[in-house]
Amino acid sequence: MKRLVPLVLMLTFFGFSLEAAKIRLKPGQSLQTAVDQASSGDTLIFSTGTYLVSGVTIRKPLSLIGENYPVMDGENKGNIFLIAAENVLVRGLKFIRTGKSNMDDSAAIKFFDSKNCTVEDNILEDTFFGLHFSNSSNLTIRNNKVKASATREFEVGNGIHLWKCKDNLIEKNEVSGHRDGIYLEFVTNSLAKENFIQGNMRYGLHFMFSHDNTYLRNTFKRNGAGVAVMYTKNVTMQENRFEENWGSSAYGILLKDISDSKVIGNVFQKNTVGIYMEGSSRIDFKENSFKENGWALKLMASCDQNLFQANNFSGNTFDISTNGNLVLNQLKENYWDKYEGYDLNRDKIGDVPYRPINLYSVIVEKIPASVMLWRSFLVTLLDRMEKILPTMTPDEMIDQSPKMRPYDFG
């Protein structure tokens, strides 16, 4: 005990020396040297200016904070920051000019084997990949602006790219001009919310084999092919907006081999196809609005046990189309603006069931060039005849309780 007293007094007296240091950097200084000389927990503060840096490797807990967005210029030489550590913070920096290589996925910031790291309030411009994470967990990716200006898909990588990561928060980022805005593969137990993903060349959001994730209040707008969701289970997509994704292969969402998931309270507006589904099962679609799409829903015959309940369908060219006669899904209590039935008992439910698939949509599915006949008298005549004597549309694709008025989702 007596030996401990001097030690305690010494630690108390010299306590200031044990605190994390703040190290101020100016343009022209070697960032790698500063990182190597810093102790775990130190903060590197970047003064305003341009720093010519590439391949800076960080393997200890550090905070890297910029004042007035100092520029990290990678001089087109590969990655700018490489981070393999826990508890690293990168905030308030501007990154430009990474290398352009698919061999090593050149990125502004590349994390691997990291944990409890935060990247927030940064600007990334004209980088190949923006933020790249692999085999990492407990990441916070918040309020970053990630923008590229390539003209061809192979000239650019993904804006925010995660591979084999878990327990992450991706929040309030803006991503544009990349191949995929956000790309997730083998990512689990994560939340992506309030991101604005616009004008990317392929998908606004693209994920595969990424289970148990939630996507909340994001906007995906004018992306080359919309959003692609593949080979995944236990997904929740709620209160997102999928807008203006136009093209021959563009969708609000493409769902391929998805199961046991929820799509609730979303808006699909002005897309070529609002939702395209293939091989997907046990998904609940509730309280969604499908507005002004070419096709609100393309539901392939390989889908089963899906429920569409209490959704609004308005202003779509086609509400639903399919490629087969077998129907293993349920429509219930949806509002259809094309419904022409009546409500004699005034319970706000139509007394006559509604068949959302018309003959013309079946023909267009089989003969795409026939879309040229849209709004012609022949199409109107065909659809009227099919309503009287249905022969080619699926018998079981029917809403037995259509709503008379649209839902007010607020």
What are these regions (language model features)?
Residues 21-50:
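Acidic Gly/Asp/Thr-rich repetitive segments characteristic of extracellular carbohydrate-active
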Residues 74-81, 102-111, 126-129, 133, ...:
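Extracellular beta-strand/beta-solenoid scaffold signature
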Residues 4-14:
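Sec-dependent N-terminal signal peptides
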Residues 32, 40, 51-65, 72-116, ...:
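Extracellular beta-strand-rich solenoid/capping regions of secreted or surface-exposed proteins
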Residues 44, 56, 62, 70, ...:
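Solenoid scaffold repeats with emphasis on beta-solenoid/beta-helix
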Residues 248-252, 283-287, 291-410:
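Functionally critical loop-and-helix segments that line ligand-binding/catalytic clefts
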Residues 203-295:
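Eukaryotic tandem repeat interaction scaffolds
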